[in-house]
Structures are given as structure tokens and as C-alpha cells.
């Protein structure tokens, strides 16, 4: 299965995610939804930001030029929100699974889908 199929079939097709991407920890973009604008700089910055609450709280989370307010996170997760939209990011051994959602999707719905894929990737050393 290609990375694009994971984005399309395991994230967006659930209807719990509006747009998604799977990116390398080096900032490379492996697959993304149509219409999701990402830069390698944004992705690389996010990859370095796990467990850096102070930096994320001060600077927010930037995806596609949009700044999301940092809500919470740890060494594996980053969560953010802007108005009626949000972002949920899971870090694996080699990648980040990034999902955006918008109302009426609830943050918890997006989180379950993204974390399920992230956990599967971790279990398979990806």
C-alpha cells in the first residue's frame, strides 16, 4: 500500500479527518490530501517540536501558512486548534501522521483515527 493510500483510505475516507498528510521526520512530504499546502520547512519544524511545549505555546503550530493554537502534546502527539478547525499529529519512528479536521467533526473523532494509524505504524517499526 502506498503512503497516498494510507492518507486517502485510512484517514480522509473515515470522514473524521478533513485533510491529512504523512511526512518524514526530515521534513519530506510522503503523501498528502489534494488542496493541503505544506512546506518542508513547516514539516521539519513540527518534527523538531515534539515535547517542546514552551516553543509550541509561544509560536503555535503552522500548517499550510495557517497558525493553530497549541493545545497539548508530548513526545508522540501534538494537538492544536483555530476557530472551528483543529490539527492532530502523531509521531512514529520515521514519520508524522498529520490530520486536520473542521466542525462538525469532533477533536476526539479525529484523534481516534490518527492515533490508530500511528500506533499501527509504530508496531510495524515505521
From Swiss-Prot:
Q: Which Pfam families match?
A: Profilin
What's a GO biological-process term for it?
A: regulation of cellular component organization
Asked if the keyword rRNA-binding belongs to this entry, the reply reads no
* GO terms of molecular function: actin monomer binding
Q: Which family does it belong to?
A: Belongs to the profilin family.
Its function, per the record, reads: Binds to actin and affects the structure of the cytoskeleton. At high concentrations, profilin prevents the polymerization of actin, whereas it enhances it at low concentrations. By binding to PIP2, it inhibits the formation of IP3 and DG.
The identity of this protein, by name, is: Profilin
Q: Which organism is it from?
A: Branchiostoma belcheri (Amphioxus)
Amino acid at each position: 500500500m502506498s503512503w497516498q493510500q494510507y492518507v486517502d483510505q485510512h484517514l480522509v475516507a473515515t470522514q473524521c479527518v478533513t485533510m491529512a498528510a504523512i511526512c518524514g521526520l526530515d521534513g519530506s512530504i510522503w503523501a498528502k490530501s489534494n488542496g493541503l499546502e505544506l512546506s518542508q520547512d513547516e514539516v521539519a519544524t513540527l518534527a523538531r517540536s515534539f515535547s517542546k511545549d514552551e516553543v509550541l505555546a509561544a509560536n503555535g503550530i503552522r500548517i499550510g501558512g495557517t497558525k493553530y493554537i497549541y493545545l497539548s502534546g508530548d513526545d508522540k502527539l501534538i494537538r492544536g486548534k483555530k476557530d472551528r478547525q483543529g490539527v492532530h499529529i502523531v509521531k512514529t519512528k520515521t514519520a508524522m501522521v498529520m490530520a486536520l479536521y473542521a466542525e462538525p467533526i469532533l477533536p476526539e473523532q479525529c484523534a481516534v483515527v490518527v492515533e490508530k494509524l500511528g500506533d499501527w505504524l509504530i508496531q510495524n517499526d515505521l
